[in-house]
A protein has these predicted regions:
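Extracellular and organelle-lumenal recognition/adhesion modules and their flexible linkers in secreted
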Residues: 1-175
Length: 175
């Protein structure tokens, strides 16, 4: 795996024309003209070109980028920026490879480029909270904090730092 805190990785052997994709939480919202930042950590058994694409729910390409992945038994980080070439609120992100190869993906992130102060929060939601002028906001709350048991309850110290270095946690809603 990528590091001791990451308990799983996705090992994929791409066949010619093969593709993997992720639909996010009920779809990946893609807006025409918006920018998206993608990065992933991967190790590969050969040099290859990975095409990362924003796709409609039906699989139509809404914007893509190509990344040259190098043969390496250690994880390397790969970054690209995608521009939405159409709008589909139930889109997806896909990865394809230009040849037969085996790639292990240790962590993948796709985020809109435009977020509140660059920290990943949706601007409209963060501004609504900011505009309340609250002196205290309880977040997260309820059963999210307590976890399924004491061992996997959320601890603040495990929620800071680079996201790919943090341990994953199974939440009460099982995602």
């Amino acid at each position: 795996t990528l590091n001791p805190n990451r308990k799983a990785a996705l090992k994929v052997t791409f066949a010619p024309g093969g593709k993997i994709y992720n639909i996010g939480y009920f779809g990946v919202p893609v807006k025409e003209g918006d920018q998206y930042r993608l990065y992933f950590f991967a190790e590969s058994d050969t040099d290859a070109v990975i095409t990362a694409a924003l796709e409609s729910e039906e699989g139509t390409d809404l914007g893509n980028c190509e990344l040259s992945v190098h043969k390496d038994s250690d994880y390397q980080r790969y970054d690209c920026e995608l521009t939405g070439g159409g709008t589909d609120f139930k889109g997806r992100i896909s990865l394809t490879c230009d040849r037969v190869c085996t790639i292990t993906l240790g962590f993948i992130s796709l985020m809109p480029a435009k977020t509140f102060k660059g920290h990943g929060l949706r601007e409209d939601l963060a501004m609504a909270l900011k505009n309340t002028n609250a002196k205290f906001i309880r977040f997260p709350g309820g059963c999210v904090v307590e976890g399924i048991n004491e061992q996997n309850a959320l601890r603040f110290s495990r929620t800071i730092g680079p996201v790919w270095e943090r341990p994953g946690a199974q939440l009460m809603w099982h995602y």
